[in-house]
């Protein structure tokens, strides 16, 4: 474990972005985080289950619905117009209330997951759709305030810990600023051609983001063009998730975001874990970028993939049985396929 951090070095690492983190063995630099070591429980926990569930599941049209519904010609775009109306009037904000979770039963689900052999459980925290599934203090777009009107993350956490399972949360928020750019577009053809989608309404900017008028329409999976204000908002929001739900694992959908903001968040996660475990870091952070995890720092995650050779450090693969968000009439992976994957990976 890392030794004591000089006060001047600690202050310099945090002052760059004006970020406050839990004091402990780490500061928000790559050099400091190299001292991180993966906890033994994660090495031994070979199988976990993830509930990739949120408001985009409500239409039952598969993954990325909140983005695809604004892409003219996409099946989700057509389905949305048929079942909700034109995107200039009825957008994703109007889909959210249909996500009610009337039959949500985390206790029953966790019993099933435990019987299946899962040693840890993941709850969705927030997807690219900018909707928090916890009692978030940084946005009104959360599951306690609307939709199910339940603390989904909190209820899942309670059920998992009750059964001795480790608890994880996933965050996909960082890219939301760019991902939702299509909601500021308009139809190119038809009776609504040129009529802006509902993302351009200032009343909805806290969901769809207040994008500059000249913001590039082409989506790219990076942080180019993302303002510091959004980076700070991301840090504050995910820190709120960490502080209130103390996850054993925090998963980011992509690489570690926004350099000093992301590094400070990971340092905060590890330091808070050390505070709660007598100086021992029991938390795990995952990144999909190999370079992030080359020396300590975090656990490498492969989405729908796996390592090409035996690795000295533990890694994780995440995959789904069908579509990431629920999709009606889709073929699921067979039990044999799932078992073969587990045998191959574990």
Predicted features and spans:
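N-terminal export signals
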Residues: 1-14
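Mature catalytic domains of secreted/periplasmic carbohydrate-active enzymes
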Residues: 12-346
């Amino acid at each position: 474990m890392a030794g004591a951090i000089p006060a001047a070095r600690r202050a310099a690492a945090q002052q760059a972005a004006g970020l406050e983190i839990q004091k402990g063995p780490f500061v928000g630099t790559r050099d400091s985080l190299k001292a991180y070591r993966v906890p033994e429980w994660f090495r031994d926990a070979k199988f976990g289950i993830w509930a990739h569930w949120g408001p985009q599941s409500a239409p039952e049209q598969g993954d990325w619905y909140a983005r695809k519904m604004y892409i003219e010609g996409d099946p989700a775009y057509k389905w949305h117009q048929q079942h909700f109306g034109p995107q200039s009037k009825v957008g994703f904000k109007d889909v959210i209330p249909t996500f009610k979770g009337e039959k949500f039963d985390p206790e029953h689900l966790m019993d099933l997951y435990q019987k299946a052999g899962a040693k840890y459980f993941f709850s969705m925290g927030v997807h690219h759709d900018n909707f928090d599934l916890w009692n978030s203090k940084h946005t009104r777009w959360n599951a306690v305030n609307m939709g199910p009107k339940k603390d989904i993350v909190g209820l899942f956490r309670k059920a998992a810990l009750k059964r001795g399972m480790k608890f994880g949360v996933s965050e996909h928020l960082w890219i939301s600023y760019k991902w939702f750019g299509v909601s500021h577009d308009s139809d190119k053809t038809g009776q609504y051609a040129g009529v802006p989608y509902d993302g351009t309404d200032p009343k909805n900017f806290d969901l769809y983001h207040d994008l500059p008028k000249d913001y590039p329409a082409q989506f790219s999976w990076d942080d180019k063009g993302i303002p510091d204000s959004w980076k700070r908002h991301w840090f504050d929001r995910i820190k709120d998730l960490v502080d209130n739900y103390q996850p054993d694992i925090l998963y980011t959908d992509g690489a570690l975001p926004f350099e000093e903001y992301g590094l400070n968040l990971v340092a905060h996660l590890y330091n808070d874990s050390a505070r709660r475990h007598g100086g021992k870091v029991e938390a795990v952070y995952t990144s999909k970028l190999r370079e992030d995890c080359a020396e300590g720092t975090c656990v490498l995650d492969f989405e729908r993939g796996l390592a090409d050779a035996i690795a000295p450090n533990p890694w994780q693969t995440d995959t789904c049985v069908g579509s990431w968000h629920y999709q009606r009439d889709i073929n699921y992976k067979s039990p044999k396929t799932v078992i073969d994957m587990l045998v191959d990976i574990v």
